[in-house]
């Protein structure tokens, strides 16, 4: 999770890119410490930012000093539970500041999961390699919105993180005759391993 992180060192950026490309998940929150120029010039070309960042929108001095998420029926697995307001009304959060994004409608690897009433993207997802990146346009504390003050914030965050982890962590519960899947670093491909169990010992190669 990058929560209002200004920049990363080159070595960190390289490691993060490899992690996501190999199936890891990355969650990015905005905020006042985020270096917009660095994100656009470094994180975006590395494939780790769903869209170019624009200016920071600020409604604090407007007659209505906030916007909200658009009420909708979510079909995304991480948000589907919130289609029922009894599980948490996402539209009740007041968003005062957020990063505007410049979306590319032709990029099939990026999709908006939630929007604000202004039309700006609130939550964007990008598929990168075998992994996923989620970008939330506001901060994860209460500096820019009332999101963390709402009862649904903890399950909302947990759902997002669980979804991101699901691409790299196969289910531990298997049905009868279902194949067991385990992920290993790419540089171990082709190495021989021993699979042991109650009734069988078998050598196989990782692919």
PLM region descriptions:
Residues 1-207:
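N-linked glycosylation sequons
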